[in-house]
Amino acid sequence: PDDYMMKPFSQEQLRLRLLRALNRKQQLLPMLTAFQSADTEQVLVECKKIISQNSRYANYCRCIMAEIYLEQNRAQEAKQILNEGLAVRESAWLRLFLGRATQQLGDHDAAIVHLHSALQLRPFMVDAYRWLAYSQLAIGASEEAIATLERAVSISPQSGRLHQQIAEHCLSQHDYFRAKQSLATLLDLHRYAVDDNPQILGSYIHCVILHAINNQDPYHIGNLQKQVNTALSRCRDSLINHDFDFHTFEHICQARVQMARGNLPKGKQLLYKSTQDYLDTPETMSSEILSETILAMLQLGEFEFADQLQKSLPPEQAKDPLLTQCIQSIRSDTVITERRNQYQLSNELGI
């Protein structure tokens, strides 16, 4: 970027970079001022002015406009403004946003073509890999989607967003091992982000449990308690002094371990005992405790109760893609479904 001034080779190069950055800020000042004020309509007006002047920053403004249009679900208008830019000259960024626009319109095959074109122009464009994976997954090419994301991770290994996206895709395919690996990396990247840690930790433990249940090797079930305890121990110091009920969270996780090991009565008893102060008033629960309780109830087979609790989730938490995939994965997992059915049948028979 023009503003990037790390390790200039000479004073002259530094001077030129500063001049370019200053010139850019001056030309884009009205648009940037509107952007900072969150006045999206004025941003669109200023971008159109800059584009009409055939400025060197015209394509940059087209991308800004496309981003706003996509946020407002106006993909057709975004597509039009991007095609106008591509008619002048090819651009990786315009191709990226055109891929996103066609993706929002539901044409995933065309989106894949545009995103591949962007990557041919810029092979290290991580965002293009991310959106390409969404379209590949939408057309059923799940392995290609995961491979695309793994390629992006090799370029940007510190990107938490990429690791979370891999985990979401793997959960949707019931590939708990790879989801667990990605979440372990994500947990490590967020080890000092106390606000994000509980949700990531809960998702990681969820994947550890489902991987152990679905694996035919009894070693994984036998080692499950140790893995969960290790994960909880790693985050205990940072969370226990924070405004977070770590003890309840830990007991819910231990209840899920007991269920996974086949001891459903003990798991159920521990779950209800640890959450008894909250279940009558779920709105008083933190979103992390609530989401973990929902997953535990689903694992136990208490679908109606879980659905009631799910309605109490804060709006932003209810839309969280990682939590959504965790809930969907446990609802559709065949091994857990068989165990629940067997447990319910035993109860009906009085066993």
Name every feature range the model reports, one short phrase each.
Residues 2:
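Short, glycine/charged-rich "phosphate-handling" switch motifs in NTP-dependent
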Residues 7:
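A Lys-centered signature of the CheY-like receiver
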Residues 13-25:
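Receiver (REC) domain switch/output surface
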Residues 22-65, 69-71:
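CheY-like receiver
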Residues 24-35, 59-64, 92-96, 130, ...:
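Alpha-helical tetratricopeptide repeat
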Residues 36-37, 72, 139, 261:
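Charged, alpha-helical scaffolding/interaction elements associated with membrane systems
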Residues 78-289, 293-296:
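Flexible loop/N-cap segments at domain edges
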Residues 288-351:
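C-terminal non-catalytic interaction modules
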